[in-house]
Amino acid sequence: MASKLWQSTATGSLHPLVEAYTVGDDQVLDQHLLGHDITATKAHAHMLKKIGVLTSDEYQQLAAALDELLNEWKTGTFTLTSEHEDGHTAIELYLTEKLGPIGKKVHTGRSRNDQALVMMRLFIKAELEAVAEKLEAVAQAYAGKIATIGQTEMPGYTHTQKAMPTTVSMWLGSYHDAFHDLRQLVAHSIAAIDQNPLGSAAGFGVTLPLDRQMTTRELGFAKVQENPMYCGLSRGVFELIAVQALNPIMVFAGKFAEDMLLFTSQEFNYFKLPVTMTTGSSIMPHKRNYDVFEIMRATAHAYPNYTLQLQAISTGAGSGYHRDLQLTKKITMDAFTSALNTLEVLALCVSELEANTKRLAEAMTDELYTVAKINELVEKGVPFRDAYQQVKQSFLADSH
């Protein structure tokens, strides 16, 4: 069998430079995604048995071979090679080499278009669910730290200047609430993309009586993505929806990183991490550098590039399939890797956070209480603006 599903003796071999350029790093990416591709292939084969394309014995052989392939993939004994154009090709070649003509039947009623769509859809669902779990872990880390150091007073800041008194609990609690709430955004994204594209084939459906409801149930999707052209139209866009849900997560992670870089500086010295979580200098032996927060801040700043790339590529491709969309795979995978790694590190940093209660107490200086003094005068019947001016004049006089 030819190493490419579309190849024949009449077409000859693809120029190696063109092949390398068009395939790109698909083999590396598909190696990671192969489990989802195998799962969807098994569901498709089961459906083919139901509609009579496969006999019961043929399906059993295919299912056993797919289970064997899945196990080989999980244990690392099956890897994609240069002879595989992509993971879809690798699966069919594996089945054909193992089962002969039976393996050649597995692609009936299916295109690599919907095969790639369902593989990525399963991946995105799983990754969003993993993000939701990480968000809960981060929220719990904040809650745990609030329970131990939350009652400590600290200055609140506006314009990076001391403003009003607050507590560590209120500061950390704001991040707890943020990450807790973002689980709802992730849930909405899952609901939006939880549609089964398998059976749309090349984007126009097929004349076979495919049971798409059956594969929807077997793969755990909420519903069938009915219009086959919409299946193709949503490629890249559903990825965009998912990655956009990660943007606010990275915004809050970046904000916390910025807070920590300020509050751990020697000038503030409010908080610290264990020495095992900081780095040093090759020339200055006294340095304790919070590289982890600098990388987190930079990662958060760069993160919108993922959504910009997905939107640009998806917008530039009209309806129907275009090879441009292949590039959305790596962007999406990298976006999830970045967000999940950030959340994992963030949970660790929060759980290991230590407060310098002595320094925080010293920082609770008189100017933080000016609004409280105004309110005391207001409660005595002084109009607010008059009370404001009295307190301001008194503060300015004392500061000179």
Indicate residue ranges for each PLM-predicted region.
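Glycine-rich cofactor/substrate-binding loops
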Residues: 2-40, 98-102, 284-400
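Generic, well-ordered alpha-helical scaffold segments in large soluble proteins
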Residues: 44, 65-72, 94, 98, ...
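Helix N-cap/coil-helix junction residues
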Residues: 53-54, 221, 382
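Short amphipathic alpha-helical segments with heptad-repeat character
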Residues: 125-132, 136, 143, 169, ...
